[in-house]
Amino acid sequence: MVKVTDQKRVFKSGNEGAAWAAKQIDFDVMGYYPITPSTQIAEEIDLYRSEGLLTTKMIPAEGEHSAAGICYGASTGGRVINATSANGLLYALEQLPVQSGTRYPMVL
């Protein structure tokens, strides 16, 4: 017979959940531009860093296009993540086909 263990229930916002999931993959670099509604993801990841739970390098960009470029460059040597919004994804779009052609991975 299979024994079911008690599960801990945690209530988080979508952004907090995304940051928590990102923490689990122990990524190396986050290129980001704070844009609503995804700003909280970078804030939560920075909080994890301040608590010593992550050693991620966070690189702020001057726009979504630049943030995607930071992730593209960093993906050649480590795990990267970028958090954005629908509008931010549109601004970053020019970078993505180039990166996909090189097969360097990025969590978006």
Locate each region found by the language model.
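Thiamine diphosphate
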Residues: 1-108
